[in-house]
């Protein structure tokens, strides 16, 4: 290889190896590195969902908690698991970098899994068995037992805070934005990334859930812990192939400096003279393997932060690039806001959908019954199939019509998922009304121990459609917040996805408790320990209306959203969302 060829072979996006040396495209990154990341994700998701999928059943049957309490404990924990990535993203971007942050967090994650396995294995760490079907008459878990169990759960949540925002970003970093082939592969990466997630989830919601229900919780959780250990081992094997981006300082501090500087100069008159705005020389960016961003007209108030007024203090004067990076993170906030309600939908399939399944006939044969949480496997399978069809058929077809490399825009993809969410909750409400009717006809309204003579597969449509919806909205969320974040804030951008999930789960807890308390005062509560006496059909229809209102707000938000400028100049910059509202009105 000639000197010129060696020079051309180096990546141009600033990626380095662990020692800080430039890396070659031919020797690092791309799919040969991503294969380790993808395999890691399969086993890690198997481990995580091996715990979370059946958690509401464990809390009900083993810790003897009621419907609302167990559901809220699950959603609060899952919400925390999605909230801690904000801290993980900060540590990665400001201090240790993604790789080191990920490795340290993985050790904490594994510790939490091991402690959780012990808590479900040792008899002294859980309350005695209860023979009655009414959990209100069972002995509750002691303070120490709850402390060990939830301590392990939240240790696990802290660990995931450093893995979730960084692992997908590490994977995306393996593709050089300045190489046309790499850029095309990155578009497919997020689809196959989600494919790996749901492949692991499918195994967890079928095999591991069955083991927990029929063999033992200790063995089921033990297998999850071994799966996590194996996933970390696989990730470390690929270390020499990974490309790394250097930490570029705290994004929170940078954003705070821009906002403070602009407020301090609020009374300063704006200037049309570009020389009055501060920016670093291009060579200084080149030395850091970074790129300047040109000034834009959006959120013009923040431009004052880069206006030269005499003081050069960093809290009074920022670069144009820092201002534009802050603008971009702020411009994504309205989009983030309208993803909260869709995230609440995921909380329903992890809690109330599963509790519904416990009331139905779960027998496949005389000797085999399907665990209620295993219906999540159909959601996963539906999403796996949908992703493949979307990536291999839908994108190619739509690309010819729209000229967009992705087929349709990311926000259009989100919108389709939101429409499906409305349909899902309408179907769920109708199905639940039918379930209550069958229970009443067989005199089972006040019974909890006897299953309703109605197959658990009656719930299948809502599970399958949820997988289809996730193939649109969840992948679009992940890719949108990564793609639209500035280069120096990619981990923070990815953590927007985690924030969406966290807020959605916490909102679900608040909503469930509020609706339960309010409807109790009106007479028959919508959510009770005995679901046959509840009115989940009303609750689900309320969700359908909530999703409809959120979708209308979504259309307003995207009408005014402008995509960020692409520093590689390989795509149109500052392009408005093309006629999505018009498309929906046609």
From Swiss-Prot:
A biological process from GO: response to nematode
Transmembrane segments: 77-97, 100-120, 141-161, 189-209, 217-237, 334-354, 370-390, 408-428, 449-469, 492-512, 538-558
A Pfam cross-reference name: PTR2
Main location: membrane
Expressing tissues: Expressed in roots and siliques.
UniProt keyword annotations, A-Z: Membrane, Transmembrane, Transmembrane helix
Localization in the cell: Membrane
Record's bilayer topology term: Multi-pass membrane protein
Molecular function terms, GO-annotated: dipeptide transmembrane transporter activity; tripeptide transmembrane transporter activity
Family: Belongs to the major facilitator superfamily. Proton-dependent oligopeptide transporter (POT/PTR) (TC 2.A.17) family.
Name of the protein this chain belongs to: Protein NRT1/ PTR FAMILY 5.3
């Amino acid at each position: 290889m000639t000197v010129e060829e060696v020079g051309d072979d180096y990546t141009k996006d600033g990626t380095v190896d662990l020692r800080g040396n430039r890396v070659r495209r031919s020797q690092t990154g791309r799919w040969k590195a991503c294969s380790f990341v993808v395999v890691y994700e399969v086993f890690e998701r198997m481990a995580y969902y091996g715990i979370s999928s059946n958690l509401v059943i464990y809390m009900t049957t083993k810790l003897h908690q009621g419907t609302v309490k167990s559901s809220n404990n699950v959603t609060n924990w899952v919400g925390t698991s999605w909230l801690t990535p904000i801290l993980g993203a900060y540590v990665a971007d400001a201090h240790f970098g993604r790789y080191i942050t990920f490795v340290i967090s993985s050790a904490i994650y594994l510790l939490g899994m091991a402690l959780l396995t012990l808590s479900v294995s040792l008899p002294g760490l859980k309350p005695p068995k209860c023979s009655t079907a009414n959990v209100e008459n069972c002995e509750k878990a002691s303070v120490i037992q709850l402390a060990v169990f939830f301590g392990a759960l939240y240790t696990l949540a802290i660990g995931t805070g450093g893995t979730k925002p960084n692992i997908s970003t590490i994977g995306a970093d393996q593709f050089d934005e300045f190489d046309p082939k790499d850029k095309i592969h990155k578009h497919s990466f997020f689809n196959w990334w989600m494919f790996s997630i749901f492949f692991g989830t499918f195994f967890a919601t079928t095999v591991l859930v069955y083991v927990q229900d029929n063999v033992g919780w200790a063995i089921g959780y033990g297998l999850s812990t071994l799966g996590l250990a194996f996933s970390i081992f696989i990730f470390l094997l690929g270390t020499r192939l990974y490309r790394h981006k250097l930490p570029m300082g705290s994004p929170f501090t940078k954003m705070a400096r821009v906002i403070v500087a602009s407020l301090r100069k609020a009374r300063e008159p704006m200037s049309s003279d570009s020389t009055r705005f501060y920016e670093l020389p291009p060579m200084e960016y080149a030395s850091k393997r970074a790129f300047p961003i040109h000034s834009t007209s959006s959120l013009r108030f923040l431009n004052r932060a880069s206006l030269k007024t005499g003081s050069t203090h960093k809290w009074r004067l920022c670069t144009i690039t820092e201002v534009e990076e802050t603008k971009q993170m702020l411009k994504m906030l309205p989009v983030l806001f309208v993803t909260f309600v869709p995230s609440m939908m995921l909380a329903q399939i992890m809690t109330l959908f599963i509790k519904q399944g416990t009331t139905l006939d779960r027998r496949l044969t005389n000797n085999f019954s399907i665990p209620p949480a295993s219906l999540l496997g159909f959601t996963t399978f539906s999403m796996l199939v949908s992703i493949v069809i979307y990536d291999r058929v839908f994108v190619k077809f739509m690309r010819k019509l729209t000229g967009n490399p992705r087929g349709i825009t990311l926000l259009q993809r989100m919108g389709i998922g939101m429409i499906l969410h409305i349909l899902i909750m309408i179907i769920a409400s109708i199905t639940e009304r039918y379930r209550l009717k069958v229970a009443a006809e067989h005199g089972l309204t006040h019974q909890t121990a006897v299953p309703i003579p109605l197959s658990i597969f009656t719930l299948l449509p809502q599970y399958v459609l949820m997988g289809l919806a996730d193939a649109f909205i969840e992948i679009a969320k992940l890719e949108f917040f990564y793609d639209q974040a500035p280069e120096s804030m990619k981990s923070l951008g990815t953590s927007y996805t985690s924030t969406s999930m966290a807020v959605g789960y916490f909102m679900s807890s608040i909503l469930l408790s509020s609706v339960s308390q309010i409807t109790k005062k009106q007479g028959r509560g919508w959510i009770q320990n005995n679901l046959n006496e509840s009115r989940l059909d009303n609750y689900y229809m309320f969700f359908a209306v909530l999703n409809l209102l959120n979708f209308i707000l979504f259309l307003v938000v995207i009408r005014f959203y402008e995509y960020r400028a692409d520093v590689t100049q390989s795509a149109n910059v500052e392009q408005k969302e093309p006629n999505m509202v018009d498309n929906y009105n046609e």
